[in-house]
Amino acid sequence: MAAMIFAQIRQEDSLRDIDMALNAHASKLYHIGIEQSPKSTLADANERRNYRIYEDFAKSLMQRARRQYAHTKLAVEVDNAVYALDASTIDLCLSLYPWAKFRQTKGAIKLHTMIDLRGNIPAFLTITDGKVHDVKAAPQIPIEAEGIYVIDRAYIDFDWLWTIEQTGAFFVSRLKRSIKWTRIVSHRVDKSLGLRSDQEILLFSKKSKAKYPKRMRKISFRDDTQNRILVFLTNNFVLPSETIAALYKARWEIELFFKWIKQNLKVKSFYGTSSNAVKTQIWIAMIVYLVLAILKERYKLENGLSQLLHFLEVNLFERKLLISIFQPNPRKVNVEDKIKYKQLKLFDF
């Protein structure tokens, strides 16, 4: 695992590159807990060592990170735990990854993810073929009483929403246009806040109503930044209308999470072609993300995760205290030093 974490931090492109980089630092590998391993050993470990080892370790880090960020303030003023759900597709070549079915001529995998918006820490992640619909992974997600689950329209399945309701939790989603409903009550709204309506509704069709028989709340909100009306669906009748709209806006954080992972870690190209190798690499990428998040909160660092990752990369083989990597003390240079170590001109020979 240490060698693969090394590869993630340095963004190595292939097993050969990992092997060459490790060989170049052979005398220093002991200090970071890595044994010198040939490319064939790394390839064999990728194929044969069960990815669930790394999955279990990542999940233990998820729990630790969430505990550390438990008291972090949300952008939206609510006391509940707030989670955002979404799925992100990673394209693969079907001829190289025939197990990753997506379309007839295209392969892909999908990361079904739920993040805790306090710290943007993954609270749930599973990896499937690209053809698995987002909502199919939803029943695997543990529902927490009083938790708020912010979802997009792909997750509207009334059986699952009823499970959330029965657990004593809440959902916030966009309303699908195809859903038929009947208005029961309308409440006054402050239109100066962008609100257009706040209504209590019941599902109209017998099939949908059998799955979700209770009232829900429908809120219309005008988004001036995009010049469109957004219609939200929730089972929370306590929070103000504008708070419901703000909660859905906060769902954007999971899009930023996926963007960060894809830009800063190695999750779009892989060191092996088997399902085990791909899942191993993704879970190790999650481990790196979680370690960075834990260090950021532990040392109260103001730097972004991208900066912290870069600090690790350039100091990987330095024998320093961890905190000194992230909070370096610049050496003060006095006047005598400036004269002694005067910068030479490029062509002054």
Question: What does each model-identified segment do?
Answer:
Residues 11-14, 26-31, 44, 92-93:
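Short active-site-adjacent helix-start/loop capping segments
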Residues 17-27, 32-40:
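A short glycine/small-residue-enriched secondary-structure motif
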Residues 100:
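A glycine- and small-aliphatic-rich helix-loop capping segment at beta-alpha/alpha-beta transitions
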Residues 32-49, 59:
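Major-groove recognition helix of helix-turn-helix-like DNA-binding domains
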Residues 1-17, 21, 49, 53-60, ...:
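Single, function-defining residue in the core of a domain
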